[in-house]
């Protein structure tokens, strides 16, 4: 890449979601409500799984890790977005932008890999029930979770490494409420086609391949379960769990594919999809998993009664 005497950009200006004051106040109330549900909701999931002796299966261990990632993921953009609703000029430093990029892709990719691990867990539980405890032992679960985090870290490092080598000489306005690669690449003062191609292959291709693989695996499991649909409550519970996982997979991978598996051009739906991806999706995880899982709901009631209500008395 050619070097020149560029005026180095030290900060980026975010356009936000709306310029209308009334709309900003409404959005602030809505997103603050979401965030205040995401944090305690996922913390309650983690505490319930940690404290209840009956929730010791690998599925709940993975669910606790998913809840932790949701807390982290929502906290990357939500706090600054909420503050920016009351700021006339929404600014983020270059370093802050790079940090936001890194953690978004680190946590987001880790969550995708973790969902893949959860699909393998369901496969072992349904197809190899007699050997499930041996196959999905705690040691293997810890290794798979660690590999998910490591995969997310490597993916994020690649994305950030491609961004920091680009020159930025102005303009410095990002048509978004947070720093994302698709926006930052667009304002670089250089030909970014090679970088875009690598990013699309890294983010977009991974999303598409994982999404197709996950849908195929769950379709196979559901077809297998439907053959034994009259065999009892355990089969119905397994089908319910699979439907929950499929819902999460679609909600996670759909927006990601829309954003990253195409050229980084601007479209009218970009902000809406980004809001769904960064704010609404972490909200749906605890709702879907708790509402469709009787064991988790019962355990949550016990934890709330024992550790919260009793202390208040």
From Swiss-Prot:
**GO annotations of cellular component type:** plasma membrane
Entry annotated with the keyword Glycosyltransferase: no
Glycosylation sites (chain numbering): 5
Q: Which domain of life is it from?
A: Eukaryota
Q: Where in the cell is it found?
A: Cell membrane
Task: Please describe the organ and tissue distribution of this protein's expression.
Answer: Highly expressed in the testis and olfactory bulb.
Taxonomic path: Eukaryota, Metazoa, Chordata, Craniata, Vertebrata
Question: Which regions span the lipid bilayer?
Answer: 26-49, 58-79, 101-120, 140-158, 196-219, 238-260, 272-291
Q: Which CDD domains match?
A: 7tmA_OR4N-like
Further comment found in the protein's record: The human olfactory receptor 4M1 (Q8NGD0) is not the one to one ortholog of mouse Or4m1 (Q8VFT4).
Q: Where this protein primarily resides, as one coarse class?
A: membrane
The protein's name: Olfactory receptor 4M1
């Amino acid at each position: 890449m050619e070097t020149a005497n560029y005026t180095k950009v030290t900060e980026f200006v975010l356009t936000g979601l709306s310029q209308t004051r009334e709309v900003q106040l409404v959005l602030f109330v809505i997103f603050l409500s979401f965030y205040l549900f995401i944090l305690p909701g996922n913390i309650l999931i983690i505490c319930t799984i940690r404290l209840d002796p009956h929730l010791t299966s690998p599925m709940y261990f993975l669910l606790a890790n998913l809840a932790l990632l949701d807390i982290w993921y929502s906290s990357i953009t939500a706090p600054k977005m909420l503050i920016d609703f009351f700021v006339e000029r929404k600014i983020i430093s270059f370093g802050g932008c790079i940090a936001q990029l890194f953690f978004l892709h680190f946590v987001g990719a880790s969550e995708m890999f973790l969902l893949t691990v959860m699909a393998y867990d369901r496969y072992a539980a349904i197809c190899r029930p007699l050997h499930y405890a041996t196959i999905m032992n705690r040691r293997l679960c810890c290794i798979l979770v660690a590999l998910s985090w490591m995969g997310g870290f490597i993916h994020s490092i690649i994305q950030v490494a491609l961004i920091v080598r680009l020159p930025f000489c102005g303009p410095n306005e990002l048509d978004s409420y947070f720093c994302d690669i698709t926006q930052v690449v667009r304002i670089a003062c250089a030909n970014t086609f090679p970088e875009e191609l690598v990013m699309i292959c890294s983010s977009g291709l991974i999303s598409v391949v994982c999404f197709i693989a996950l849908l195929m695996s769950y379709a196979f499991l559901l077809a297998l379960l439907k053959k034994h649909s009259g065999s009892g409550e355990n089969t119905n519970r397994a089908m319910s769990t699979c439907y929950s996982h499929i819902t999460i997979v679609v909600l996670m991978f759909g927006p990601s594919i829309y954003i990253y598996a195409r050229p980084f051009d601007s479209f009218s739906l970009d902000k809406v999809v980004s809001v769904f991806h960064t704010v609404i999706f972490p909200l749906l995880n605890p709702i879907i998993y708790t509402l469709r899982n009787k064991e988790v709901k019962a355990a949550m009631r016990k934890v709330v009664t024992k550790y919260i209500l009793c202390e208040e008395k």
